[in-house]
Amino acid sequence: MEIRMSMQTGKQSICFETPPYIVSSASIVGKKEGEGPLGACFDLIGEDDKFGQDTWEEAESTLQKEAFGMAVGKAGLKKEEIRYLFSGDLLGQNIATSFGLMDYQVPLFGLYGACSTCGEALSLGAMCVAAGYADYVVAMTSSHFASAEKQFRFPLEYANQRPMSATWTVTGSGAYVLGKRKSNACITVSYTHLRAHETLANLV
């Protein structure tokens, strides 16, 4: 008889018995982000913040679509091998996510955690893989400066003056492929603290 120890730790943590691995990752950002100190770290930097689309929302959808394809490609997988998608954005009803990933026809768990969406996606995706519900999942998120301004502040067409101290929402998307295939990074612990979802990735 196989004896399994509980992976539950305390009231809000999970220590994975068999840690899932971050098999690959991909990041796509806008021109402003590419000009910053982390510019060399991104896989793709767009020259046009609309990424060839007509609207800001379509541009953000394109970010997710391309980031997903790039991450899956870097993992050497086909989209059919991805069991689930955990993703979200900052827009109402997650429209950037829904329309951006629709063509892939992968079951989607839509998340809305604001700045914690990526960590939440990694936590839930890691739990899914560790529990044996999937061989591979993708955890991802996106945001776009212009679509976020339109959603939460002032549309750019309003020409509102921004103080120098104002925050700037990232134009970009990040995607991770999680699976049991070993790599140089695994997720050992998943925990929630209040409303913030965080994931610890340890180098092995």
Tell what function each PLM region has.
Residues I28, S87-Q93, S143-H144, S183:
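Short glycine-enriched loops at secondary-structure junctions
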Residues E47-G52, S98-Y112, R153-Q161:
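Glycine/charged-rich beta-loop-alpha catalytic/anionic-binding loops adjacent to active sites
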Residues I22, W56-S116:
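Conserved beta-ketoacyl condensing-enzyme motif
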Residues Y112-A139, L178:
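Active-site-proximal alpha-helical scaffold in enzymes
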Residues M7, K11, G119-E120, A148-I187, ...:
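Glycine-/small-residue-rich "gating" segment that lines the acyl/pantetheine channel
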Residues T192-T199:
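Conserved small/polar residues in nucleotide/adenosyl-binding loops
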Residues V23, S87-G88, V137-S143, L178:
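Short beta-strand segments
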Residues E2-A40:
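N-terminal amphipathic/basic leader segments beginning at the initiator methionine
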